[in-house]
């Protein structure tokens, strides 16, 4: 289990955007990523790393539970060109008692290059976000429309979680993204499950 704290890089925005947390549970082929924010509440993604498919678990209006299916192989990612540039650095740094490799990462939205820390001997497949980093990220930053977010690992526990954690609960309705949008913004046609 990995637990990250998420805060805005810009200290002036930290009062407007409160700190969040992210937990990542994994076994050999599945990951469960749990996020919580005061604005959106709880968000959980269950991803099959081999099949590259996922479910996003959401609760709408505190009553209706949805599991939104996504086939990441078919997802319209387009030709996304990474704006991140990477430069390896010498020497290692300790974080939570672990020796981490260093990488200076730059992006047009960063005021200056930011140091990322990663564990080279641990796979990057669990987070699956920066292709230029050859290991599990421990400390990193992500550009969002609201600003730059800093992620920092605050806890790492090695254990095999209960496999029920990786299933979609029975009270969740499995839908595609289009079916979910039809439910949220109904038109004159019937919504999902009303045919």
Which residues are covered by each model-predicted region?
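Extended soluble regions of mature proteins
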Residues: 1-195
């Amino acid at each position: 289990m990995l637990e990250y704290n998420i805060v805005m890089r810009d200290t002036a925005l930290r009062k407007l955007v409160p700190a969040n947390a992210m937990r990542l549970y994994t076994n050999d082929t599945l990951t469960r990523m749990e996020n919580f924010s005061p604005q959106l509440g709880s968000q959980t993604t269950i991803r099959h790393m081999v099949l590259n498919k996922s479910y996003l678990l959401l609760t709408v209006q505190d009553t209706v539970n949805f599991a939104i299916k996504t086939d990441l192989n078919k997802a319209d990612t387009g030709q996304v060109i990474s704006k991140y540039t990477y430069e390896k650095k010498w020497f290692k740094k300790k974080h939570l008692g672990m020796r981490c490799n260093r990488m200076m990462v730059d992006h047009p939205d960063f005021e200056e290059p930011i140091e990322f820390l990663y564990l080279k001997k641990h796979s990057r497949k669990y987070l699956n976000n920066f292709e230029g980093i050859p290991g599990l990220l421990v400390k990193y930053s992500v550009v969002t429309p609201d600003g730059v977010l800093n992620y920092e690992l605050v806890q790492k526990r090695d254990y095999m979680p209960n496999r029920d954690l990786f299933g979609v609960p029975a009270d969740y309705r499995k839908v595609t993204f289009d079916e979910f949008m039809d439910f949220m913004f109904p038109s004159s046609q019937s919504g999902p499950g009303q045919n």
